[in-house]
Amino acid sequence: EMQRSLVGSEMCIRDSNASHLRQGLTGRITWGIIEACDVQEVRGKLRIYLTAGIGIAPTICRLAEKGVFIELNTWHSSRIIGMHDIYEIEDPWFRAPVRITQPIEIIGLPYIEVSPEHVRGIVMTHLPDEARAMAPATDVTRAIGQHTADFLVWNMQQGFIFRNKLILQSGVGSGANAVMGALGESKEVPNFSIYTEVLQEEPMRLIKEGRVMAASTGALTLSPEHLQELYNNMNDYRGRLLLRPSEISNCPEIIARLGVCSLNTAIEVDIYGHVNSTKVGGTRMMNGVGGSCDFTCNAMLATFTCGSTAKDGRISSIVPFCSHIDHTEHYVDAIVTEYGVADLRNKSALEKAEALIAIAHPDYRPILREYLRLAGAYGGHTHHILSAAFALHDTYRRKGDMRLVDWGEYIKD
């Protein structure tokens, strides 16, 4: 319903990096609503034990001027108590280093502590989370997963990333979930750890199987069935799974210190390596940017994955110019489709274009090469034809298939 309102311009949104939410630019916070699995009074203070996600709950509790309401949701098991590490970063000038050197190193408390007077009410509920089960893996996502695994192994062999300390971050969605599953199945990828914003079904399975040694996350995005399985088998995860506030799960300082390799999902990529990860056609929000910018800018290796086409081949995921840009070419190291890997490191703009066209769908490679050839007549470090940069998007809007593009309609001189 919220997504429909955003697409219809009935609701406005400011999409910001998740690690920047506490700067106060959104104005004063009047009330807070916090979901909890338990509340305990200890030595005159209330301890709020959270459920399957933390987000910005600690900051909301601290800044809410009139107080907070607690939604005590008994659907969530109190067995999850002890799986949270709640720590707030100090304000600048007094900010100490965030001393996390391992993915599940504990530096905070397993609860939020507030004064009883700050809690204005407790509402009892018994409601499961609304997350849906992930779509099953396809031939495309399995191929992307295998290419990603091969790319990681090659980087380890070259010494570009650490083989004995592989720490991954994974984006959200069925595609990212399937890629993580494929990495877990690869015999060449060593056991690894995860430091990420959101954990989905496949990483949870890999934790239980011992393939993932440790996982730190800001939230669990699991279907009610998978979340109930977690609660029923909590001992399989305890000591290997930790939930953190979003400003810690997405903290640039920690991402850089741990040498995280990020794996995020792209909606579209242009031939020079810019990535659109949020808006379909540049206008319709698919999802927020979340912490993907934090990870992409600070990761040791920043990779994006996507199928080469969408809508039964009528849309190419590789385009001359992105209709919206979330991640610039300066931070994107590699793109993976079912046709291979485009390693963009140490490449000029035109070398990046050749590498990306090589992993586009075969139907679109001649179209993209023709654009690059025509744009070459205009010269420059980066070759573009401003009147034709969005020709594929416009052709899909008018004709329903990017493959029907006619460059002559857009290039008049």
What are these regions (language model features)?
Residues 49-55, 70, 75-114:
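His/Asp/Glu-rich metal-coordinating catalytic cores
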Residues 53-67, 93-97, 187-201, 274-305, ...:
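Gly/Ser/Thr-rich active-site loops/lids in small-molecule metabolic enzymes
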Residues 193-196, 200, 205, 209, ...:
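A glycine- and small/hydrophobic-rich beta-loop-beta segment
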Residues 1-8, 12-13:
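Single conserved hydrophobic/aromatic residue that forms the stacking wall/gate
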Residues 87, 329-413:
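Extended hydrophobic packing segments that form well-structured cores
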Residues 259-355, 363-364:
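C-terminal catalytic subdomain
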Residues 120-135:
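Gly-rich Lys/Arg/Thr-decorated short loops/hinges at beta-loop-alpha junctions or inter-strand turns
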Residues 136-231:
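N-terminal active-site beta-alpha-beta segment that forms phosphate/nucleotide-binding
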